[in-house]
UniProtKB/Swiss-Prot annotation:
GO biological process: L-histidine biosynthetic process; methionine biosynthetic process; purine nucleotide biosynthetic process; tetrahydrofolate interconversion
Organism expressing this protein natively: Prochlorococcus marinus (strain NATL2A)
Residues binding NADP(+), per UniProt: 165-167, 190, 231
Entry's EC annotation: 1.5.1.5, 3.5.4.9
Lineage top rank: taxon: Bacteria
Function: Catalyzes the oxidation of 5,10-methylenetetrahydrofolate to 5,10-methenyltetrahydrofolate and then the hydrolysis of 5,10-methenyltetrahydrofolate to 10-formyltetrahydrofolate.
Keyword Nucleotide-binding in record: no
Gene (UniProt): folD
Pathway membership, UniProt: One-carbon metabolism; tetrahydrofolate interconversion
NCBIfam families: PRK14186.1 (NF010783)
Entry protein name: Bifunctional protein FolD
Amino acid sequence: MPKILDGKKLAQEIELILQQAIESGLEVAKRRPGLAVLRVGDDPASGVYVNYKEKACDRIGVRSFAKHLKEDISLEELTEIIKSLNEEKNVDGILLQLPLPSHLDETALLRSIDPDKDADGLHPLNLGRLIKGEKGPRSCTPAGVMSLLERNQIKIEGKRAVVVGRSILVGKPMALMLEAANATVTIAHSKTKDLPSLTKEADLLVVAAGKPYLIGENHVSENCVVIDVGIHRLPPDEENMKELKKTKLCGDVKIFEIEDKVAAYSPVPGGVGPMTVTMLLANTVDRWQKHCGLPLTISHLLP
């Protein structure tokens, strides 16, 4: 039987560590960590994700400075809001919820966030720190994947890793983190020819392509470890329609095809998703400890 990499359980364990770090530092810090999540417009998926993050803040005692901004906000207006949060001493982390409306310059806005308050690890300076192996905020989803692998004692060093997807949000930083852990890494993408022949060579396969059910039985080798980063809502099939069931969650991987073949896999939901939110909290608490002159007791949680 394959090992199921339970991100929900691990996220709860790490949240407890973060909560304890906050409580032990309050006497010196005189304030709780602060996280500002900026949501622009009314994208339903973004609303769900922001709600998850606010609930997570409540659970561990992080103060939320969330802002829900109008769809047609200008680049200048949003930049000014970010600048004011950069100056706000009670805010330790800033996250710009992506995707943004098409009229906004994502790169310019990410650059406007203080790198020291970059809770999502996407500022160019922090991506550069990742390349150089220097400490700093880390991209949340790849950091969550690394934690999931480490806590389940899955060896990375010397392994052949294939990352499907090359986004700045997941694919590229994921490849860098695996390389730093001494894996031999290949990145596949939408222009890769004969994807199955490449992915079958992987000891560790991380799929972040954003395409439901892209990877199936013919893409994986025996005893491979598969990490499914994707999450999608599929319309109910005919059987579910009769039962009036809602849409169905799935990932980029056909788990039902591969589960008897692989050594371990992350489920959807309950795998990478909870870890992404927890690493956002870890980045924020780490920044809070730094800003308040506290011992950096949780930095080991970040790759």
